[in-house]
Regions:
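Structural preference for solvent-exposed beta-strand-turn elements
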Residues: 1-372
Length: 372
């Protein structure tokens, strides 16, 4: 039975859109597979890791019959990648085998029954649906994702807080040393909904969401339940479990009344930090930032007594302050922006710094000082 017949690039594109969550090593071997279902001309591809489920639909041709199976996702993708993009590929099924043929190449893969594939049971208590352009959500994730914790015992930090309330969508991430917040405006008012998306979900959404570079991106529809979130975009359905726990009160962390404000160019500041980072201690990554009227200086050193010094001219008339930072925390924030100017607000050597963007009121980045 011919399951489908289509160009390599079309099949590969559909597969790659769902394969990002597939774990090669898992206690359930079938989770290394992609579930393939065919209903007439409609092809449905589904993957799962028991926490996240991703599904996409494509019309790629073949006969009009119904069919379902599961096959190793990474092997199927590797085979397709090895073929020319304009190669016509035929997938045929018989018993527990799936045969892939293109040109004079032929591959036969072992399959597992589709009935054994563990689909995620969707929640029954989803709240109201709301949507934003994909490029808006992708931009918000880009602005905060780097501040997520990695394998923190405070599991609620290993993800991003989504808060939808009124006409605002706010994303917040923190690892306890820094906090990033980004906000966008919704088209309609919605009741308050607050969830924590897991780190893996966030990074997969960041990979899949489209923006201007990808052409017509369209909206992403979102719905939140007590223990799940559901997203729909670009013909895909994305369901994920949520992180349980209470996210820290981020409003208490954000400084409100710092008296010293420095506005400077993002690109030259970032370049100076990247150069100074070369000679920081590998373990602590500390730099000293000295700000005084007209001048910002950056200095770093390491255990080998090597030093780096940078100097920038700035328009500043406040107090003279010397403060230490983990240079990686500053570089992460500045690297994930695309603006020309930033504003840094400081109080003293022991208070957290606040970085904002003059023309973008919805972004805030808080970074704790470091004793050097």
């Amino acid at each position: 039975m011919i399951v489908l017949k289509a160009a390599q690039e079309k099949i590969l594109s559909a597969l790659q859109s769902v394969a990002g969550i597939v774990e090669r090593r898992h206690t359930l071997p079938i989770l290394a597979n992609v579930l393939i279902r065919k209903h007439g001309a409609d092809l449905e591809l589904t993957t799962s890791d028991l926490e996240i489920q991703v599904r996409t639909h494509a019309e790629l041709g073949g006969d009009s019959g119904d069919f379902s199976t599961t096959v190793g996702a990474s092997k199927l993708i590797a085979i397709l990648r090895s073929m020319p993009s304009d190669q016509t590929v035929t997938l045929s099924a018989s018993q527990n085998k799936l045969t892939l043929q293109g040109g004079k190449s032929r591959f036969t893969l072992q399959t597992m029954p589709s009935d054994d594939f563990p689909l995620v049971q969707e929640a029954a208590d989803f709240g109201p649906m709301f949507s934003v352009p994909q490029k808006v959500l992708k931009s918000l994730i880009n602005q905060v994702h780097f501040a997520m914790a990695v394998h923190d015992i405070r599991y609620y930090l290993n993800g991003i807080l989504f808060v939808a309330e009124g006409k605002n969508l706010t994303l917040v991430a923190t690892d306890g040393h820094r906090l990033a917040l980004a906000q966008a405006t919704l088209e309609t008012d919605i009741p308050k909904q607050e969830v924590i998306l897991p780190r893996k979900t966030v990074l997969e959404l960041q990979r899949l969401l489209r923006d201007e570079k990808d052409g017509d991106e369209g909206p992403i529809e979102m719905r939140f339940a007590g223990n799940q979130a559901k997203f729909g975009f670009s013909g895909m359905e994305f369901v994920t479990k949520l992180v349980e726990g209470k996210f820290p009160d981020y409003n208490r962390v954000i400084p409100k009344n710092h008296k010293n404000h420095v506005t400077l160019g993002r690109v030259p500041f970032l370049a100076s930090l990247q150069r100074a980072a070369i000679l920081t201690s590998e373990k602590f990554k500390g730099v000293r930032v000295n700000i005084e009227p007209g001048t910002l200086r950056i200095a770093s050193s390491n255990a080998e007594q090597e030093e780096a010094k940078e100097e920038l001219e700035i328009d500043y008339g406040g107090d003279s302050i010397e403060i230490g930072f983990n240079v990686t925390y500053l570089i992460d924030a500045l690297s994930n922006m695309s603006v020309e100017m930033i504003k840094m607000e400081l109080q003293d050597t022991s208070s957290s710094a606040l970085i904002t963007v003059p023309e973008q009121s919805g972004f805030k980045y808080v970074v704790m000082p470091m004793r050097i």
